[in-house]
Amino acid sequence: MKKLLFVLVASSAFLMATAQSVHFGVKAGVNIASLKVENGDDFDTKASFNAGGLAHIHVTQHFAIQPELLFSGQGGSYKVGNNTGHINLTYLNIPVLAQYMFGDGFRLETGPQVGFLLGAKSKVNKVTVDVKDSYKTSDVSWAFGAGYVSDMGLGVDIRYNLGLTNINDASNTDVQNRVFSAGLFYQFMDHHKK
């Protein structure tokens, strides 16, 4: 995990130093998250949030790298008798996305994401329990997405994060994150490149 994070950060720093241009920005959006359970019933979806910053690094006219630093609410919901329980996981995520940019502001993106668990709570009937010890402290996923940015720097994006690693630290059953997100972002731009 540390090696992967080092490679992602070092690559981003190198690209920033050699890039055609770098635009920083902020973003926020909604997550629809669930947990995939190996050989069991998957968790139902739950709504949460994501928010943070980005650096859009133009490498060529049509290719960019975009590292981000995001606070992200994840987890899932489940039935307990007639009640609904929630697993609320809070991560600090660092995606590093390769983007192909069409000339009209549209983008396709994909890349790895490393996440660090900041907190984990289980909530049923207004009773909240800390369950952070039941989950691993880090997560690796792969992101797929698309977006659009205007000449003014305001944009929208959608993304799906497919968890690749087992986050369950309490038993031998594999549990993986699944997150669909949609949001808005603003890039501080020079109005010449998208």
Show where each model-derived region lies.
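Outer-membrane beta-barrel architecture
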Residues: 9, 52-54, 95-97, 145-147, ...
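Residues that define the transmembrane beta-barrel architecture of outer-membrane proteins
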Residues: 20-22, 43-49, 88-92, 138-142, ...
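Repeated loop/turn-to-beta-strand initiation elements of outer-membrane beta-barrel proteins
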Residues: 22, 62-65, 106-108, 152-158, ...
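Membrane-embedded beta-strand positions of outer-membrane beta-barrel proteins
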Residues: 26-28, 67, 96, 110, ...
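Transmembrane beta-strands of outer-membrane beta-barrel pores
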Residues: 30-34, 49, 71-75, 114-118, ...
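Outer-membrane beta-barrel "beta-signal"
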Residues: 31, 147-154, 162, 176-194
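Outer-membrane beta-barrel translocator domains and adjoining extracellular loop/strand segments
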Residues: 36-42, 77-84, 120-128, 168-173
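Residue-level signature of outer-membrane beta-barrel architecture
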Residues: 55-57, 100, 116, 148-150, ...
